[in-house]
Amino acid sequence: MGLTVHQLKAKAAEWLLLKVKYPLEYRLSCQRLPELSHQKKIILTLLPGHDNLGDHAIAYASYCFLKKHFPAYDIIEVDMKEIYRLARPLKRSRHPEDIVCIIGGGNMGDLYRYEEWTRQFIIKTFKSYPMIQLPATVHFTETKRGKREERRAIHTYKQHPRLLLMARDQTTYEWMKLHFPDQDVWKQPDMVLSLDESSKDETREGVLLCLREDQEAYLTKEERQQLQQHIQETYDQVGLITTTIGIRVDRTTRLEELTALWTELKQAQVVVTDRLHGMIFCAITHTPCVVLRSFDHKVMEGFEWVAHLPFMTLLKEPNEAAVKEAVHQLMKTSSQKGEEAG
């Protein structure tokens, strides 16, 4: 299936940004940050500037983790757009103990070119720094473009002499071990699982649906509509939420938006989701959750990290009957989930 005119224009605009505008900003940047040169720092970068709260939760959790475990370091947050303009000033202000951390997530691959090409820019630009790729999922499509982008990524990652790679699922871990036998590769959970946003004070009612409508969805549009209708016919109180909220979010507004979403989850008896961070948000808020698979391995393998929680149920082949039964079972035990999670 060919691309529409709108899609072609969007891809052309993205290419111009990544290949012309942003590299020019990098080369022309003359800003100086002398105040940073006297303090060792962790440059936390590839932060999102879009509306996906899952990615913002990763950035927030990464910041909190680094702040807690590396108190002697200043944590400097730099988003995907800023890094092109600030890379040279940051390098000019380098302290001998500086470290670069790239936030994790599901954008390692060819589905999200902006993020992947910016990751490669960071790896090449900060080649002399110790660098950590925080827990990520890789997915390169089985297409000519996907294979080409995979070769390019492998070549770029291999050129960094001190790059620690972290995988948040087994498939990614095996991919990294295969292609980078001489580099350190760790398997670690998604950074958001380091948070605890649980509360025993909330009154829980009804069911919330949090389902994908993008290129990562496993369910078709018709299947989603049928599932929604089925749940609404079975339960009196059914709501719809999403982790992509339709407004741009940055590091100054992310906690407010995340807190609002987490509060909404904590007021539900059961959540049905096919989103990885829908599942993870339920885990950290101790919200009973029926997890449906996504189009790739991300959700099913991500479930490994929360499978021990008694209020989480995974459906590998979701259908109406299976979802209904799973929701029913969790409804019966939702009042005890706080004590069980304990």
Question: Predicted regions: what is each one?
Answer:
Residues 1-342:
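Active-site anion-handling motifs in enzyme catalytic cores
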